[in-house]
Amino acid sequence: MMQEIGNKKLGIRIWFIALLTAFSSCRDDVEVVLSEDILTGFPEYIDGYWGFYLLNEGNMGNNKATLDYYDFATAVYKKNIYAERNPKIPKEMGDVGNDIGIYGSKLYAVINVSNKVEVMNVATTRRIAQIEIPNCRFIKFHDGYAYVTSYAGPVVIDPDYTQIGFVAKVDTATLKEVDRCLVGFQPDELEIVDNKIYVANSGGYMGANSTGGYERTVSVIDIASFKEERRIDVAYNLERIKADGRGNLWVSSRGDYKGLPSRLFFIDRAKGEVTDTIPIAATNYWIDDDLLYVYGTEFSYITHDWEISYSIVDTHTREIVTRSIITDGTDKQIEKPYGIMVNPVNKDIYITDAGNYVTPGALYCFTSSGRKKWELEAGQIPAHFVLVPSR
């Protein structure tokens, strides 16, 4: 019986991979950009997941956003698959891939400077539609709708920027935008908990000359009315916001790149306020069970230098567990950590390296104890992960 079940799962997986590869053989009038296969040498069965997609941002202005896929069972990393599956799409994925998510049978990629959300079949990565949203940033899903943050206006540093940001509401059945809710200036990541949307407002275009030009609040939107109810004061220049297993919120501030450092903040959702400040830089993080895995990449306009850090925080006690994630010295090889994910089953840790932001970046896989398992070349500025569920 176990062999029969295993054979069925293998058959389904082969079907999924076949869909990813089938379309390259039926083009005759269009030049096809072929994907590249890389073997990691670590095939394994991960219960509940086929693998993951990795969205490479690409340097702004070059239309170099690309999409990669890693299959856990075959240990095959397929590099740059979107162009191969969609050869008739001009400029391929577009300019600056900023976020990625899966809802139902669809894969959504937020392409920031191309002002669109690319919607694909999750199994084939063939385009289904594109949704035009100006200067779009991050995406989350709830009850048949996608919610996308938007800076609304052009990409420009301006202390007098007047275009307020919004959250777009998109029907995932029709793939049409149906509503907008105004929030703060330059809203970044959003989170959804108990029928409320929490939005980290940054004001990132407005604070270059003065720290006070940045936003410092989280907008709270009621999903039923789709109206902003209130703001939660946090800190200047917010970016990330993620909920832990108890529904409380973890928010990051970029700081002002001068004297005000990046920090991680804890919002007690019941109280509706910040109750804890974690004294670590928080550029990006991933929450798995009760642990928050975070890295910081802080640049200072005073020293003109970067400071890189890694930490793990216990979301229950709100204490720093360790100020390291990588334990074998490989962190010294990583020039600019740019993305992070934790495998929810075997607890492998994935960290990307943007390098010099021009040449191809790298993807590292570490064991739960922080030792390197494998590494490979990814696309330009590898950044955003999404796991592909098998059921």
Model-inferred region functions:
Residues 1-9:
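N-terminal secretory signal peptides that target proteins for export/translocation
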